[in-house]
């Protein structure tokens, strides 16, 4: 949609006039409600000439194997424990369809007396431990027969798919999509040049513009927010020495009395921030320089500024030793203890964020946990695998006493520990109590599964580099690229990726279609990410260009079944406190802030951060995505206070081209004297604040105009009865320059409102700032 750019100084009114003039034509160009859905069996349908993968998922996995076989043949199941070669991954495993297809094909081709083993075993033949599971005349058995015949004859469609498309979904137009992206990722609106490129080149302009957008400093601020939601290291910004207090002072003496404790109190927060945000700066460095994002785990370095380099005993040269914003790649050096057979200087074996002292402390271990918590985070963050979902089964606690080593011997336990413990072993060289303390002579626990990854066991000669050994294997796993897409998707949409539905769920077919569509898109984006040499920006672009970010409506009214299929598609994410704070400033020109220590402090990122659904990375680690009563009240307060502080200030600017909100009106304009300009400014405000390019006469514009007229009439009546005075309330006056805090010249001040127009416009701004279209993305 058409928008006015917000920078440190606003656009010229020429562009503003162009945007309003284009509103009607762009609306017509973007609308598709009159288009036909096209041929086929209905919106979103596809022909049923299926690829091998889709045929298996639809006709074999869901109705047969998932229901009949996985209970025993899953990892840790009875068949698996008894050494069965046929293993099926439950749907909680990313990539389970491909893995299970490979297993099914292998056994489909394996025959005994001319008949596939995959057909004999379910009938209880060939000493099947599970005995008879299917009848030969059942629909499930016939499905297996059909699959095996197709495998033998390679009778699958090349490129065929059961995945339903989005042909019945109406997407936001190119300009609206880009506006959404700029506000989310770069804290600004599109500028005049970008708008013109989109008007000239249409959809072809979007991807290059996104590439340029993701080079801006504001994008990296947003990127670090996104990854802090995962890593939660900002917990250690809680007080000025929180992060430093984590570090072992014998390994890092500069973190204590040798240097840090001698600093003035005003300087300590800078050092603390450098240590606390080290993993986030590493991520930003990798993305800024378009290095392979695999380095988030494999980097043999981390990022340091002059302060953190001193703490970490790193020999780095900086242009300015006092510049907290100068970051360089370097390696952490710990001071060793020769009495423990440690070298005087130990260069820690780096493995991206995994070896970061902040990561190790934020996800700590204990002498009994033995790094399993860290292993769970590796699986969750970088392999898209929730280990807690994989073993969702009843556990009899009394059975554990039947085993000397339950985590290895009890099937109820080892289903997770077989996957978890080898990864935990990669952290073996770190102290069980002093989280980041590296102990090169420490070894693993013989009672646990040996260090490794998947079915590969780590050689003991690799124990000294165990984390980097693990990292190299994690990033080569197909789940790594999927995890990156999951992170980008959640950050941009606020939604979690869909889980594979239960076959007994009501509406299973529709939920399955929804999952298949999303899974196909995620795998496609993951492939592009890998092909781009693991450039993280490719994953972000893939999500932004998808219907999950861009969808706004459907062609006509979808059927109840189609509504289920499209349930995860579309916009409507509640803005985070951080994003909303920047959006307010981008749109109005001023922050919703208070002054503290001579600085403007955003209220949404301080006083109201938790109340508006944000996190503190400590006690509150999950953002609220559905507003409650308190959040609604914060939104109303924001709208009222921002409208109060911005309206008179904007109207006081003599050059209309300098205004953010009122380029078409003056304080003297009333419905009687200049209704056309008032209507035009309202049309502009809908485009500027809400991203709505509405044609003149649209009901939404009429409602806003009626609000202005009604507020004006009510106020003028109270002025006439002297119930109200002409003076604006102190907080709403334009008396001081909000940027410089200096008093305005007398002739520029706007403190009186004899016609009540300032207050009527304040009501309009408050109304729009409290709108769903502003508070949500």
Placement of each model-derived feature along the sequence:
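Aromatic- and Gly/Pro-enriched helix-to-coil junctions and flexible linker segments
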Residues: 32-233, 242, 310, 446-498, ...
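Bacterial N-terminal signal peptides
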Residues: 17-29
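N-terminal secretory signal peptides that target proteins for export/translocation
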Residues: 1-14
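Residue-level signal for mature regions of secreted extracellular proteins and peptides
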Residues: 25-26, 42, 62-65, 406-409, ...
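The N-terminal extracellular segments of secreted preproproteins, especially immediately downstream
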Residues: 3-6, 31, 48, 68-71, ...
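Conserved S/T- and glycine-rich ATP-binding loop of Class I adenylate-forming
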Residues: 1, 187, 539
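His/Asp/Glu-rich metal/cofactor-coordinating catalytic motifs and the adjacent surface-exposed loops
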Residues: 145, 155-160, 169-182, 210-465, ...
């Amino acid at each position: 949609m058409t928008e006015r750019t917000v920078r440190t100084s606003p656009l010229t009114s020429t562009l503003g006039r162009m945007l309003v003039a284009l509103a009607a034509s762009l609306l017509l160009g973007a609308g598709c409600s009159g288009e036909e859905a096209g041929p086929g069996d209905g919106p979103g349908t596809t022909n049923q000439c299926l690829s091998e993968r889709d045929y298996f998922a639809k006709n074999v996995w869901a109705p047969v194997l998932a229901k009949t076989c996985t209970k025993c043949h899953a990892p840790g199941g009875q068949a698996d424990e008894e050494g069965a070669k046929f293993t099926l991954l439950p749907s909680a495993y990313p990539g389970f369809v491909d893995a299970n297809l490979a297993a099914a094909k292998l056994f489909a081709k394996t025959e005994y007396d001319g008949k596939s083993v995959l057909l004999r075993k379910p009938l209880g033949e060939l000493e099947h431990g599970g005995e008879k599971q299917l009848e030969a005349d059942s629909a499930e058995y016939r499905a297996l027969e059909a699959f095996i015949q197709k495998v033998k004859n390679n009778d699958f469609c090349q490129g065929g798919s059961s995945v339903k498309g989005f042909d019945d979904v109406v997407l936001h137009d190119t300009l609206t999509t880009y506006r959404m992206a700029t506000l989310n990722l770069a804290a600004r609106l599109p500028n005049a040049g970008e708008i013109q490129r989109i008007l000239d080149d249409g959809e072809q302009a979007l991807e290059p513009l996104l590439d340029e957008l993701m080079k801006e400093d504001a994008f990296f601020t947003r990127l670090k927010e996104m990854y802090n939601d995962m890593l939660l290291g900002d917990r250690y910004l809680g007080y000025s020495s929180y992060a430093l207090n984590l570090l072992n002072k014998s390994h890092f003496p500069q973190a204590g009395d040798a240097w840090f404790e001698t600093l003035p109190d005003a300087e300590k927060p800078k050092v603390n921030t450098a240590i606390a945000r080290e993993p986030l700066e590493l991520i930003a460095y990798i993305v800024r320089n378009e290095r392979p994002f695999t380095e988030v785990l494999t980097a043999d370095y981390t990022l340091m500024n002059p302060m953190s380099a001193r703490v970490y005993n790193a020999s780095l040269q900086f242009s300015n030793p006092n510049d907290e914003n100068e970051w360089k790649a370097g390696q952490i050096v710990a001071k060793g203890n020769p009495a423990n057979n440690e070298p005087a200087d130990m260069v820690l074996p780096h493995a991206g964020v995994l070896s970061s002292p902040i990561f190790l402390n934020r996800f700590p271990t204990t002498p009994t946990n033995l790094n399993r918590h860290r292993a769970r985070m590796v699986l969750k963050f970088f392999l898209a695998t929730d280990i807690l979902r994989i073993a969702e089964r009843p556990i009899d606690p009394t059975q554990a006493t039947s085993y000397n080593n339950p985590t290895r011997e009890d099937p109820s336990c080892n289903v997770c520990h077989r996957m978890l413990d080898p990864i935990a072993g990669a952290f073996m060289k770190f102290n069980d109590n002093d989280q980041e303390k590296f102990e090169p002579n420490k070894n693993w626990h013989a009672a646990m599964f040996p260090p490794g990854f998947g079915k590969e066991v780590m050689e003991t000669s690799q124990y000294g580099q165990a984390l980097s050994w693990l990292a190299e294997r994690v990033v080569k796993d197909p789940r790594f690229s999927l995890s990156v897409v999951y992170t980008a998707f959640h950050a941009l949409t606020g939604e979690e990726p869909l889980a594979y539905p239960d076959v007994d769920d009501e509406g299973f077919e529709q939920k399955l279609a929804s999952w298949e569509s999303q899974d196909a898109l995620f795998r496609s984006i993951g492939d592009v990410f890998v092909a781009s040499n693991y450039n993280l920006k490719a994953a972000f672009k893939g999500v932004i260009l998808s219907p999950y970010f861009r969808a706004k409506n459907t062609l006509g009214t979808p059927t109840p079944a189609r509504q289920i299929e499209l349930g995860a598609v579309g916009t409507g994410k509640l803005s985070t406190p951080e994003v909303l704070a920047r959006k307010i400033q981008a749109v109005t020109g001023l922050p919703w802030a208070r002054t503290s220590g001579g600085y403007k402090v955003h209220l949404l990122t301080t006083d109201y951060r938790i109340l508006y659904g944000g996190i503190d990375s400590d006690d509150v680690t999950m953002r609220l995505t559905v507003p409650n009563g308190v959040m609604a009240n914060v939104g109303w307060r924001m709208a009222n206070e921002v409208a109060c502080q911005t309206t008179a200030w904007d109207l006081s600017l003599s050059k209309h081209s300098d205004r953010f909100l009122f380029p078409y009106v003056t304080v003297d304009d009333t419905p009687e004297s200049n209704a056309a300009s008032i209507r035009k400014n309202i049309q502009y405000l809908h485009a500027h604040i809400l991203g709505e390019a509405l044609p003149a006469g649209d009901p939404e514009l009429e409602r806003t105009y009626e609000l202005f007229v009604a507020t004006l009439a009510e106020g003028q009546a109270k002025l006439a009865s002297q119930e109200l005075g002409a003076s604006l309330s102190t907080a709403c006056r334009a008396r001081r320059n909000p940027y410089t805090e200096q008093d305005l010249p007398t002739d520029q001040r706007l403190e009186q409102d004899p016609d009540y127009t300032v207050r009527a416009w304040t009501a309009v701004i408050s109304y729009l700032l409290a709108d769903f279209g502003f508070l949500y993305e």
